[in-house]
Amino acid sequence: MKPTKKHISDKALNQFNENGVVNVRLQHIADAAFVSVGHLAYHFKNKDGIIDALYDELKTKQEILLTEFRIVPLFEDVNRYLKSIYQLHSAYIFFYLDTLEILRAYPTIQTRHSQHLRWQLMQIKTMLDFNISRGAFIFLTYQQRLQLAWQIRSMVEMWRYMVRIENSENETEENFLYCIWGILKPFFSDMG
């Protein structure tokens, strides 16, 4: 059996994913976890504490994926990384659908997330640098690499949100991969 704090955060994650952050109260989380609000408050002072803990989990998992990915970012590693990111985004979908609301309501998360996005951008740029140096991509200037890294990172971070806004039925891993590789494909060299 899971420790109570982890059980509560897992149930909160399910509630946020299903209903959105703004629509979930502590009572909903307590009911889902089969604990009293008082018992929940023993582990998490308030909803802010739960969201903060979930963001830390998400960020840590993303950093692990990016750290593993940057060791040798060959195309099969890039694809494996993208599949893992898709799965991670699925598990924490509330964050990607409610990003702006969360960042407005939780300034400390906004600060940490901004730092994380900058780090993520540099990791993607490093992947581009590596693949350009091995001849898999055409030559790009520093500014072009940064812009391409920004486009990839933006698509990765916002893809779910856009698919939901469009009310599309294409919210699949296959379509996610197709969109990201579609950004990269024009930059493949003959070798790539």
Predicted regions, residues:
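Helix-turn-helix
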Residues: 7, 11, 15-49, 53
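Short, basic, alpha-helical segments at the C-terminal edge of helix-turn-helix-like DNA-binding modules
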Residues: 56-62
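Secondary-structure edge/capping motif, primarily at the C-terminal ends of alpha-helices
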Residues: 66-69, 96-103, 135, 159-167
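Hydrophobic alpha-helical connector segments
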Residues: 67-94
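Amphipathic alpha-helical segments used for helix-helix packing
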Residues: 89-111, 125-129
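Hydrophobic alpha-helical bundle segments that form small-molecule/ligand-binding pockets
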Residues: 120-152, 162, 166-167
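C-terminal peripheral helix-coil segments that are non-catalytic and often amphipathic
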Residues: 155, 161-192
